[in-house]
Amino acid sequence: MPKQKTHRASAKRFKRTGSGGLKRFRAFTSHRFHGKTKKQRRHLRKASMVHSGDFKRIKSMVSQMR
């Protein structure tokens, strides 16, 4: 049986934390900021953790990532 390979697009979008979680960056941050409030823009700058419902699926895609 062949080895499971890392999904390269996912590996570029997620980072593994020291405690084993997955960190992600938020969507809607590339353009059209004039329609967003300062508070929205400030919160979009922060990274967040992957939700538990998505964690198992994403973890299998980036299983070889350190």
UniProtKB/Swiss-Prot annotation:
Keyword presence, Nucleus: no
Keyword Cytoplasm assigned: no
Superkingdom of origin: Bacteria
Signal sequence segment: none
Record GO biological process: translation
One Pfam family in the UniProt entry: Ribosomal_L35p
Record-level GO cellular component terms: cytosolic large ribosomal subunit
Bias (Basic residues): 1-16
Disulfide bridge map: none
Alphabetical UniProt keywords: Ribonucleoprotein, Ribosomal protein
Cited InterPro entries: Ribosomal_bL35, Ribosomal_bL35-like, Ribosomal_bL35_CS, Ribosomal_bL35_sf
PROSITE patterns hit by this protein: RIBOSOMAL_L35
Chain segments carrying region Disordered: 1-20
Record GO terms (molecular function): structural constituent of ribosome
Matching PANTHER family: 54S RIBOSOMAL PROTEIN BL35M, LARGE RIBOSOMAL SUBUNIT PROTEIN BL35M
Recorded family membership: Belongs to the bacterial ribosomal protein bL35 family.
HAMAP family: Ribosomal_bL35
Protein name: Large ribosomal subunit protein bL35
Organism in which the protein naturally occurs: Streptococcus thermophilus (strain ATCC BAA-250 / LMG 18311)
